[in-house]
Amino acid sequence: MSVEIPAEWKKFRYRGKSLEELLNMPMDDFIKLLPARQRRSLRKGFTPSERTLIEKIRKIRRDSKADKPIKTHVRSLVILPEMVGLKFAVYNGKQFVEFQVVPEMIGHYLGEFSIPIQKVEHGEPGLKATRSSLFMAMKG
């Protein structure tokens, strides 16, 4: 599973390890580098949906046809070094949010880059919307 690494990614280090070292590292050694929450998540094993997504990622890497983003509803998968360079479209409950995985995202969850909540900006309340607006002069 060879991966082309752009020049700007060669300088990247995760806990003192380069991207090439992370790609060649066994999964058990990589898990030891992660923070506790992600380490525990990976030690428990992959769910069936996470497993099918990882198989799909490996198939795309093997066939080297990574032109389209990989659509998924799986938000709980930790980003692994083998995902670097691929495009994902993660569902946020309403739509698919596209992003490309860069080395700085290793160790984060896919769902962190597909925010499901939008900030609500309310306008002015309308006439009779509140008790105090009953006594306001009519507009217009």
From Swiss-Prot:
Entry keyword annotation includes Chloroplast: no
Signal peptide: none
GO BP, sorted A to Z: ribosomal small subunit assembly; translation
Entry annotated with the keyword Ribosomal protein: yes
Family annotation (SUPFAM superfamilies): Ribosomal protein S19
GO cellular component terms listed in the entry, alphabetical order: cytosolic small ribosomal subunit
GO molecular function ontology, one term from the record: structural constituent of ribosome
Keywords, ordered alphabetically: Ribonucleoprotein, Ribosomal protein, RNA-binding, rRNA-binding
Pfam families: Ribosomal_S19
Assigned protein family: Belongs to the universal ribosomal protein uS19 family.
Biological function: Protein S19 forms a complex with S13 that binds strongly to the 16S ribosomal RNA.
Name of this chain's protein: Small ribosomal subunit protein uS19
Organism: Metallosphaera sedula (strain ATCC 51363 / DSM 5348 / JCM 9185 / NBRC 15509 / TH2)
